[in-house]
């Protein structure tokens, strides 16, 4: 069990979100005008339904809130905002945070450990994030903290805990599980050859199926050119689940020549 040392500060009154500025981040460059319009509509509903809570002196403004909402809604652009049910608050630390982790081993001994976290989500309860990693999620590099935690939430809709298999038709579960485990094995083989830091896919994906789904969801939306050719069968399953094809969107985008790693603050 993790004990969270948060102390919420009063959420400031937000002005009307500057959506045009909020959309001007690399990960959203390839969206069509129609998709941007629908994404903003979802993000507006997100901000009406959820409370973004700044912690430890983090200064929240309307632009930050808008970008957070847009990234939360990108994975559910075709699924619908109801897929984000089950939580009401998003807690934002200014940077990765230390928490007390309490766990019991196989013989019943209770251990306490202080660990650094970037984010956390539960089936019922808030999503906890940090601004440093949110800001690093604006580019198209394969890293996206918000999409990672949203993927866990979507995964948990299929049961009590994240399993790596989201809510899909029963007839597709065996194929999904097979392709996901094959991807994990492939990533682990690369790690064994080159090491974790040199792996072309975040090594965290090889730790368990739930993390593989969450990590590959990051790549699905922010680096589809790395995901699709490497795991084509799993890629098609992700396209079917999310109802989106970010690689096709990227290829058809007039912004395709824009640098995918532009830093936005």
UniProtKB/Swiss-Prot annotation:
Note on how the cofactor is bound: Binds 1 zinc ion per subunit.
Hydrolase recorded as keyword: yes
One cellular component (GO) term of this entry: cytosol
NADP as UniProt keyword: no
Enzyme Commission no: 3.4.11.-
Major localization class: cytoplasm
One GO process term, biological-process aspect: proteolysis
Known role: Involved in the modulation of the activity of the glucose-phosphotransferase system (glucose-PTS). Interacts with the transcriptional repressor Mlc, preventing its interaction with DNA and leading to the modulation of expression of genes regulated by Mlc, including ptsG, which encodes the PTS system glucose-specific EIICB component. Shows zinc-dependent metallopeptidase activity.
Identification of the protein by name: Mlc titration factor A
Species of origin: Escherichia fergusonii (strain ATCC 35469 / DSM 13698 / CCUG 18766 / IAM 14443 / JCM 21226 / LMG 7866 / NBRC 102419 / NCTC 12128 / CDC 0568-73)
Gene: mtfA
